[in-house]
Amino acid sequence: MMSSAFSGILGYLFSLLSGKGYQAAYWLGVHHGPTKKAPLTPVSFGPGLAGWRYIFILQGVLTIAIGLVGWYFIVDFPELAAKSSTLQKKFLDQDEVDFIVARIEEDRHDVVAEEFNLAKYCKGALDLKVWGFALIFMMTTTVTYAIAYFLPIILKDGMGFSPAAANCLIAPPYVFAGMVMMVMAWLGDKYRVRSPWVICNGVLALIGLPMMGFCSSVGARYFGVFLATAAANANVPCILTWQANNIRGQWKRALCSATLVGMGGVGGVIGGTVFRTEDAPHYKPGIIACMIAGAMIILVTCLLNLKFWLANKRANAGGKIIEGLEGFRYTL
């Protein structure tokens, strides 16, 4: 359910952004690992309600509560943001709406979505870059989920920490990952490029993963955890923003967002199976699988970048128009 909601949220957010502005959503993924060890809830309450269930119950209740509040406060699409009703808060004046709509229209000419047509919607799946972005995202979530699922086990069985210490040591790498996300989002906006940060994260993964798996020093291995965790999690907003900058048309963008989320789930399945307890303490097969994913991120990103660079060069020379819009250029 939340996966389908996530793709819808992406489609809405990216409808508000213009490629020239290069606004990046700042994503902060700070996970509090100690809550997995001893959440502040009763051991049990009622028939079948163990304490760990409250983690999911509380998250579900908060999601519903925020969704109900958001129904009123979340801003509508740009062209509708000046309207108000009993269920929708007015956010902009009409002159502000006109300015924003004009800016987005000048950038990509897709403020108002075309009438939905299944054939045209599915036609977007024939675009190779849609699957290129999906493959990069799948490789990224392979590493993301692998670390999220197995980091406590790696810290405990692979590095010798106690269960309590292992759960406490989960949080710092995610705090660091949040900082890296913010820095890369700012740099992407400042220099108006996206792919270098995707490649940078792939390189960080290729440095951090072997350190995490093969170094003899526990300190060096834990430092590798910081690099690998930052690389995997910081790459998520980089890829989402890069694909949004290079996909034109609301229905095609919706298809691409859904494809990314779906392939991200596939990456989660892969990441959830590569680390096995019998491979302790170094977990060599899992580390190698994640390193292959990091290398694939770099390779596919370079291939997409080459495609975009050649298309921009051809369009600048008066050749084939990109995405059916004169003046549109791919973001590298």
Where are these regions (language model features)?
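A late C-terminal transmembrane helix in Major Facilitator Superfamily
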Residues: 250-283, 289-293
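Hydrophobic alpha-helical transmembrane and interfacial-helix anchor sites in secondary transporters
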Residues: 14, 187, 277-278
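Hydrophobic core of transmembrane alpha-helices in multi-pass small-molecule transporters
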Residues: 219-242, 260-261
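Paired intracellular helix-loop junctions of major facilitator superfamily
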Residues: 17-20, 242-254, 280-281
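Central mid-sequence intracellular linker of multi-pass
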Residues: 15-34, 39-121, 285, 290-291, ...
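Intracellular juxtamembrane helix-capping segments at the cytosolic ends
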Residues: 7-10, 234-249
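Extracytoplasmic gate region of multi-pass secondary transporters
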Residues: 116-186, 236, 240-241, 271-272
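Structural signature of the two symmetry-related core transmembrane helices
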Residues: 196-211
